[in-house]
Amino acid sequence: MPILLFLIDTSASMNQRSHLGTTYLDTAKGAVETFMKLRARDPASRGDRYMLVTFEEPPYAIKAGWKENHATFMNELKNLQAEGLTTLGQSLRTAFDLLNLNRLVTGIDNYGQGRNPFFLEPAIIITITDGSKLTTTSGVQDELHLPLNSPLPGSELTKEPFRWDQRLFALVLRLPGTMSVESEQLTGVPLDDSAITPMCEVTGGRSYSVCSPRMLNQCLESLVQKVQSGVVINFEKAGPDPSPVEDGQPDISRPFGSQPWHSCHKLIYVRPNPKTGVPIGHWPVPESFWPDQNSPTLPPRTSHPVVKFSCTDCEPMVIDKLPFDKYELEPSPLTQFILERKSPQTCWQVYVSNSAKYSELGHPFGYLKASTALNCVNLFVMPYNYPVLLPLLDDLFKVHKAKPTLKWRQSFESYLKTMPPYYLGPLKKAVRMMGAPNLIADSMEYGLSYSVISYLKKLSQQAKIESDRVIGSVGKKVVQETGIKVRSRSHGLSMAYRKDFQQLLQGISEDVPHRLLDLNMKEYTGFQVALLNKDLKPQTFRNAYDIPRRNLLDHLTRMRSNLLKSTRRFLKGQDEDQVHSVPIAQMGNYQEYLKQVPSPLRELDPDQPRRLHTFGNPFKLDKKGMMIDEADEFVAGPQNKHKRPGEPNMQGIPKRRRCMSPLLRGRQQNPVVNNHIGGKGPPAPTTQAQPDLIKPLPLHKISETTNDSIIHDVVENHVADQLSSDITPNAMDTEFSASSPASLLERPTNHMEALGHDHLGTNDLTVGGFLENHEEPRDKEQCAEENIPASSLNKGKKLMHCRSHEEVNTELKAQIMKEIRKPGRKYERIFTLLKHVQGSLQTRLIFLQNVIKEASRFKKRMLIEQLENFLDEIHRRANQINHINSN
């Protein structure tokens, strides 16, 4: 996850304009956006982290740090203003400290135990400045100086403020104010001669002198290619130059003295593992000192390790199952020289000075070798002093068969004494992978001393506190002065005590003052003169002199309207059209608008279902083609994304108005349950009260299908039956209070007695009720008078327009869907609800098919089979009814 930190120059000199008409700061903002677009082409850019630092005073210089998201980064970038000084040194130190904030907590640097190239946090700092003189509060500086004192704990462990995986690049804007007459030549971008260039080269980066917009785009494309995971190493030659490969004679044409390839400051690429996305390694680069167990602290290290290479040709050594690390070198004069030798079968050993206990140069820990195809040079990192270790391990497994002898152990122990103790951990893992887990004893100490461990742990805790403090301070604005402090010019007596001043007063008033004025400035400590608040608009109607002359007529009109419309609770200081005059830059700021919107009120009665909007096609509920306000999408947009097809969209629909008829609170009637076939039937099973069910509707519901009042809620049986005496009043009260609106209908009619069926299966009662809800009773008035009390007949007419077929069916569908989703195989309630479906036969069949489709979604095979049998029975009985009616 590379970190891309942009350090933007926000000094006042960035307000200068180029020949394009834009300021340097606007050019810098556009360059950042262009870089992000170019970087987004790479799939690896998904893990990029962007940070933004300016030239302001810390901690206000950090605009976007570790916790800020991409939107915050872009918003802070757009709001940058060019004001202040060119404090490049302080800003660079702030940027490096921000990057190093968590390194001591995570242990990336691994102080005192070797440098792990595979444990890194690559970062690139891109500075965009105008290359002007460095200015501070103390004056103008010619050279770049970074502050030595850093508030970050643990900064004393590294000599430089940066680390080996952090590089600095600078875009120095040299755009002229006038158009150049000469045509631009397509050449390389030169280095800039400003003070930041040496700092870039020290970190492994470079500077770009940008003279035209075309050159700026070229630099940005080059910077995108520089985003690589790797660490910077100083390669230095040790010993004599290599002899020519051809005949072993020295090359006379080769110039003497220092060559560019003798000392290179370049990057080695640390490629991430394609499977895990994280680099994998085994061996560290040794420290430049021998660890001392008695030392209470660690000596400071350099940011970039100095790796010396010997030009003596050696054979590359590798044995089976022994891991090694391979890193590709960035193209440099050193890689070019090695590739020109065209000897991929030989290698040059690499060392770190003072890494051994008794040797100044140390022992080799790897080698440089050209690839077989001669297209790159690789650094192979091996175990420390590998020319001694590899033959020992080869003999152990090939000769001794993993059973070491006494002589071999003595040789191995003597090797361990020449190896830094922090190599014991990686070596133990390596020999375990090779098949010798007990070769190195666990009792051997290879860690740091207790005092050093305590010291590092203390630094880690302090770094964590500092990290939390810095992260918490990001985004805070500079505290503005609320007023101008009043300071006394002198600490002497006031002007009132001067003799000439007193005489002057006496000459004017011809009277001696009774008391001298005590105008001592000490009485005004903390006194401030208030500043004018630019955001506060003056109330111009209070003072006529505050009104500009050109706005007098407008104010008179506004004051007249406020006077005539005195019923308002407040006066309007501006016209209605001015309230909606918003700058274009703020029109899309929906988040700030939503913060000011009051929270919506809660539902008056959340248990009542909302009325379904059925205008037009009732089955098409999602209006995807509607034009809605984008501000509302932030609130209600994502809520309907995962709606299932066929499920009613209940969100965003106005709530159904409750019917205020007295019948809702009237006397409850015990429903009469009769058998389909004849005779006294068993009572309908009472259902338990369920808190999630919709509240019961009144027993006497009246629908408005025709001009005549058709009472669908009281369904009469035309077979002469009596009320079953087995149903107790308590049971019926329980059923009435807990059942659904449709479950209150317990008296289906039967027109099928003439068919002569003695047994119609389990769901015969439901089939009869399902068929006959759309049949009209023989005598509407008789049906109503038989079942509804006289006191309720007049009141029942008021309910005629309260409920419709669609509303009843919608509530039934919601309850049936809940029953389908419940676990188990108790489907009696589903068939009980199905018999109360309203509407024509075609509407009921469509309703039943939707129920079957929903049951198939939840793999309810038994329910599907019963519903299909139920559907076949309906078709069969409907055909018989049609046959009887035709006869």
Swiss-Prot record:
Residues annotated with Phosphoserine modification: S804
Main location: nucleus
Motif Inhibitory loop per UniProt: ranges: 626-633
Tissues expressing the protein: Widely expressed. Expressed in heart, brain, placenta, lung, liver, skeletal muscle, kidney and pancreas.
Keyword Membrane in record: no
GO cellular component: actin cytoskeleton; chromatin; INTAC complex; integrator complex; nucleoplasm; nucleus
Protein name: Integrator complex subunit 6
Example GO molecular function: transmembrane signaling receptor activity
Induction: Frequently down-regulated in nonsmall cell lung carcinomas and prostate cancers. Down-regulation in prostate cancer is due to CpG hypermethylation of its promoter. However, some involvement in cancer is unclear.
Quaternary structure and interacting proteins, as annotated: Component of the Integrator complex, composed of core subunits INTS1, INTS2, INTS3, INTS4, INTS5, INTS6, INTS7, INTS8, INTS9/RC74, INTS10, INTS11/CPSF3L, INTS12, INTS13, INTS14 and INTS15. The core complex associates with protein phosphatase 2A subunits PPP2CA and PPP2R1A, to form the Integrator-PP2A (INTAC) complex.
General function of this protein: Component of the integrator complex, a multiprotein complex that terminates RNA polymerase II (Pol II) transcription in the promoter-proximal region of genes.
Entries under CDD domains matching the protein: vWFA
Database matches in Pfam families: Beta-barrel_INTS6, INT_SG_DDX_CT_C, VWA_2
GO biological process: protein localization to chromatin; regulation of transcription elongation by RNA polymerase II; RNA polymerase II transcription initiation surveillance; snRNA 3'-end processing; snRNA processing
Species per Swiss-Prot/TrEMBL record: Homo sapiens (Human)
PANTHER family: DEAD/H BOX POLYPEPTIDE 26/DICE1-RELATED, INTEGRATOR COMPLEX SUBUNIT 6
Record key words, sorted: Chromosome, Nucleus, Phosphoprotein
Domain notes: The inhibitory loop acts as a regulator of protein phosphatase 2A (PP2A) activity: Asp-629 and Glu-630 residues mimic phosphoserine and phosphothreonine residues and bind to the PP2A catalytic subunit PPP2CA active site to block substrate-binding.
Localization, UniProt: Nucleus; Chromosome
Sequence ranges assigned to domain VWFA in this UniProt record: 3-227
Family: Belongs to the Integrator subunit 6 family.
